[in-house]
Structures are given as C-alpha cells and as structure tokens.
C-alpha cells in the first residue's frame, strides 16, 4: 500500500509534511519494530468493505506521485533520566488517590476523581537569571511521568508578572499534531522571543503579563517530552493533561484556587474540546476550569473545508492567490471531499477518516501550497520551508538545543525539535484528523464560555471557516448566535484607545473574533491586539 503525507497543522503554523523516511534506512532493530504494525495495517485493509477499499484506491489513483511510502511509527527519543534528587518536589499520583473524604451522604469517597496511580509529577524551581528569561518571575519546569506506559511530558510554568496570588492560570497548547508548545512560548506569547543571535528578548506583550501560564509539550515525543510508546489520537492525550493539572495544583494549591483557562491554536481545535470535556467529566477535581480559547483551530472539517476555495480566491478580505482554473478545480473537488468527511463523521472509523483527510488536504489545500505562498499567512511567500515558513522557528529550535538551556530547565532528551512528523503521521493514520470533535463543544457551552478567535490572514485554518462552523454548530443558543452580525472590536485603553483590531460576535457562552492583520499565529503578528483581547476575555467581558 502507498500513502501520502498530509498537510501539517503545527501549533503556530501549517505546512506540507516532508517526504516520509524510508524505513529501510532505519537501524535493523527499528525496522523490525515497524514490521508488525505495517503488516497489521495491510491485513486490516483486506477486511474493509468494498466502499472503504474504493476510497483508499481512489486516493491512490488521484495522487500516484505522492503515494510512495508506508506510514511510519514514532521511535523512542534518546534521553537520560535525571535522578530524583535533582527535583525539588515529586508528587505521587498514588498518594493523591489515597486521600478519602466523607461524602454528602456520609460515605467515604476519593477527594479527587480520576485514575492517577500510575502518574508522578516532578517539579524543579528554575532560576530565571540562568537564562535571562523574565528575571524576577517565579518559574517551574519538570515532567509528568506515566510510569505504567513510559510517558514523560515536559512543562514550563511562568508565574504572572502582575498579581500571581489572584491572577488566573492558563494552559497553552500548540498543535501539529506533534509540535512543541515551546514554539508558542518563544515565537508568540511567552515572556521572551529568540532573535537571530539566538538570544532571548523581553516580550512586553507576553500573556503572563496578567496570568500565570503553563506551556506543555504534548503528546509524548514532542519537544522535550519523550516516551518508549506513542500517542496517536486526541482522546488518549487528554488523560495525560488531566493528570498533569491535577498533580500540579495538588503541589501548588495557591494556584488551584485561581480561575483556570485552556488556550491553544491550530490542531488544539481538536485537543481543547477533548481536554476540557475530560476535566469537566470529573466532578471531584481541583481544577477550576472557567473557559477555553481556540485560535485559528481545526475543529469541524466538514464545515471548514468549504472555505479553502473562497479564502484562496479572493473572498476572505485579501487578494486572490489562485487563478480561475485552480479555483474551479477546488470547487469541483469539494462535493467528493464533503461526502468523504460525512462518512468519517458517521462512522468515526480510521479506515474511512484517513482517506478523507488525504483526499481533501490534497484536493483543497494542494493548489494553494503549490504556489509557494505561506499557508499561515496569505500576504506573503513561505520564507523558510525548512522551518515551516518562519526563520524564527529555527532560532527557537537552535536555542532550545543548547546544552546550557536544556540543563537549566532539566530537559532529559538529547535534542529538541519543534515538530515531530512521526507523531503527525500517527494521528493521521489513526483517523484523528477528520474526526468530529466539534460535537463536544455544545457540552462545554452548557458549563463554560468558549472563545474561537482567528487571524484573518491565515489560509490553513482561516477565519471564514472558523466563523462558519461556530454558526453551524447546533446548541441551545444557535438561533440567537448564528444571525448576529460582526461588530467592531477596538482597543479600550492606552494611547491606541479606539483603534479597530478586529470584529466580534457573542451570545451566551459562545464568542467568535476575527483579528485584523494576523496570520495563523495571532500573538506573533499582532501582539498588542492579542494581549488586549486575552486580558479582556480573562476578565469576563464577553461572558
């Protein structure tokens, strides 16, 4: 069987994945490790229905030049685990689970829900002066360990610059799937960026200006995280996030009492509905979840894929990138694409969802990608294809690969990479890409506010598609929300008071924002506007 690389939604950006690695080039032991899953994949294909086999055959016939290699599976990252004596604190999940309290009826019950026995949290107070990143701000780094499954997730916590005793706590997630949230830290919204001299530069518009922020490298084998196993779908990753937050707030109860929010972008449009639902499913928890924020996310493919042609062909507020012939070819491909996504939604079967992802990405994203235009920002060309179009991403990777940086934060892997393409392919071949995670959003809206924001120059997760899926979503407030017009969003304070930074519509717990002049990474392109809406959202202005 031959398969095709999918388009990659990195947390901060999106690009075509590089060619697959030839498994014959791997060490013999690694090749043997891959043999069984590839054999199982071939065997499963033999059992498919005629319709499902036809979908796979059709994808191969439409894109013969790209269907060159079998999928690969992620290999363990080289690492050296630090001794327990290195860490200031180790929080044992088993200890948390052993705490019983009297319930409302007098019966004993666990103080905190969830299966946490296999998890530990390692914590180290990081010296800010060692790296020069936000000196004076309290920082913690460490790992969440799933000892049962050999998974180790890296996190980096920055306390609020303002009033950490009262300011909210935010978890930030980049996407991919398979891209490090440290990209968001140093390229977008963290306390420092990295310049061309590979030195940290203070960020005046950091999101920890009025909130404490946790940056989490997930799933495993992303960034500084590592494992001997692999995670290949969003649901599995959600269990780890719940464990991390539970143990972190157990160690630091002073933060647990604050409001907590989850924010992320791109493939976090998949992650966040699942992660938030996982948290809310535990009635006895120490996580004070108040809202979620999704920026330029992929959440409802069936609706969003309608809007690649309009965005590429001049209907999104920017000049057309494609000629009429290419626009027509995208129109011609759309009905088949939507039919395949509908089949994926109806079955949620990997054998249906995988070909839908491959066909639709190539038919509707391919024409744009072939122009060389930046898929994250319709206003310009891709400046550095080796770093997903952004030179700054290369600076971040070079910085995080420095030995002194890895030592300062307690990283245990031998090297850092911004995106792990094996993880991306694992999620793709598990069918995760097209699955209907938007169906979880109505359940969230019953309990917490949801913000969908989008930079209006992004192509890959464009504002047209994000606005459309929020309007198409079936929830009790749909009839009131959907027809609402967009209104001006302006800066309320400082010397730029009254400046228009975007548009907004909001009803009940649901809010959509269009941010002017920003691509896929809103905080990078429009830092002032980004911090403006972020602070006002956390302040509860729209809910």
Swiss-Prot record:
Disulfide topology: 179-419, 313-327, 337-360, 344-353, 382-389
Signal peptide extent: 1-17
SUPFAM superfamilies: alpha/beta-Hydrolases
Glycosylation sites noted in the Swiss-Prot or TrEMBL record: 210, 509
Keywords of the record: Carboxypeptidase, Disulfide bond, Glycoprotein, Hydrolase, Protease, Signal, Vacuole, Zymogen
UniProt catalytic activity: Release of a C-terminal amino acid with broad specificity
Propeptide: 18-124
Active site: 266, 458, 520
Highest taxon in the source lineage: Eukaryota
Keyword DNA damage: no
One GO term of the biological process aspect: proteolysis
Enzyme Commission (EC) number: 3.4.16.5
Example GO molecular function: serine-type carboxypeptidase activity
Cell location: Vacuole
GO cellular component: fungal-type vacuole
Family: Belongs to the peptidase S10 family.
Function: Vacuolar carboxypeptidase involved in degradation of small peptides. Digests preferentially peptides containing an aliphatic or hydrophobic residue in P1' position, as well as methionine, leucine or phenylalanine in P1 position of ester substrate.
Official protein name in the record: Carboxypeptidase Y homolog A
Organism: Aspergillus fumigatus (strain ATCC MYA-4609 / CBS 101355 / FGSC A1100 / Af293) (Neosartorya fumigata)
Taxon lineage: Eukaryota, Fungi, Dikarya, Ascomycota, Pezizomycotina
Name of the coding gene: cpyA
């Amino acid at each position: 069987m031959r398969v095709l690389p999918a388009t990659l939604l990195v947390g901060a950006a999106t690009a075509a994945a590089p060619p697959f690695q030839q498994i014959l080039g791997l060490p013999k032991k690694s090749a043997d490790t891959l043999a069984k899953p590839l054999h199982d994949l071939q065997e499963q294909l033999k059992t498919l229905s005629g319709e499902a086999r036809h979908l796979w055959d059709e994808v191969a016939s439409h894109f013969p030049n790209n269907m060159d290699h079998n999928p690969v599976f992620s290999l363990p990252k080289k690492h050296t685990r630090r001794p327990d004596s290195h860490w200031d604190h180790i929080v044992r999940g088993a200890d948390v689970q052993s705490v019983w309290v009297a319930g409302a009826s007098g019966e004993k019950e666990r103080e905190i829900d969830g299966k946490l026995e296999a998890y530990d949290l390692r914590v180290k107070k990081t010296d800010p002066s060692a790296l020069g990143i936000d000196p004076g701000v309290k920082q913690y780094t460490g790992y969440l360990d799933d000892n049962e499954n050999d998974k180790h997730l890296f996190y980096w916590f920055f306390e609020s610059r303002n009033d950490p005793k009262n300011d909210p706590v935010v978890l930030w997630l980049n996407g991919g799937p398979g891209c490090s949230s440290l990209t968001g830290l140093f390229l977008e919204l963290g306390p420092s960026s990295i310049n061309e001299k590979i030195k940290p530069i203070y960020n005046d518009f950091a999101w920890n200006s009025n909130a404490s922020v946790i940056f989490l490298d997930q799933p495993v084998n992303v960034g500084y995280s590592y494992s001997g196993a692999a995670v290949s779908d969003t649901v599995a990753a959600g269990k780890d996030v719940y464990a991390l937050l539970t143990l972190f707030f157990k160690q630091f109860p002073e933060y647990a009492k604050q409001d907590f929010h989850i924010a992320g972008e791109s493939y976090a449009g998949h992650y966040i509905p699942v992660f938030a639902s996982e948290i809310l499913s535990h009635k006895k928890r120490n996580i004070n979840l108040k809202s979620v924020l999704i920026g330029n996310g992929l959440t409802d493919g069936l609706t969003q894929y309608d809007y690649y042609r309009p965005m590429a062909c001049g209907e999104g507020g920017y000049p057309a990138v494609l000629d009429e012939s290419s626009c027509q070819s995208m129109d011609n491909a759309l009905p088949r694409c939507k039919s395949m996504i509908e089949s994926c939604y109806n079955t949620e079967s990997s054998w249906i969802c995988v070909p839908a992802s491959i066909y639709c990405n190539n038919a509707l994203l391919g024409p744009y990608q072939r122009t060389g235009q930046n898929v994250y920002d319709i206003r310009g060309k891709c400046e550095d294809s080796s770093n997903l179009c952004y030179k700054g991403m290369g600076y971040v990777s070079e910085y995080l690969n420095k030995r002194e940086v890895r030592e300062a934060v307690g990283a245990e892997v031998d090297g850092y990479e911004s995106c792990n393409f094996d993880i991306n392919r694992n999620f793709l071949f598990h069918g995760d890409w097209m699955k209907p995670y938007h169906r979880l959003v109505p359940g969230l809206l019953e309990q917490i506010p949801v913000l969908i924001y989008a930079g209006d120059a992004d192509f890959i997760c464009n504002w047209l598609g994000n606005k459309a899926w929020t309007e198409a979503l079936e929830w009790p407030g749909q009839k009131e929300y959907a027809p609402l017009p967009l209104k001006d969003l302006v800066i309320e304070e400082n010397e730029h008071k009254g400046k228009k930074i975007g548009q907004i519509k909001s009803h009940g717990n649901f809010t959509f924002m269009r941010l002017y002049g920003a691509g896929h990474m809103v905080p990078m392109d429009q830092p002032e506007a980004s911090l403006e809406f972020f602070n006002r959202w956390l302040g509860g202005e729209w809910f």
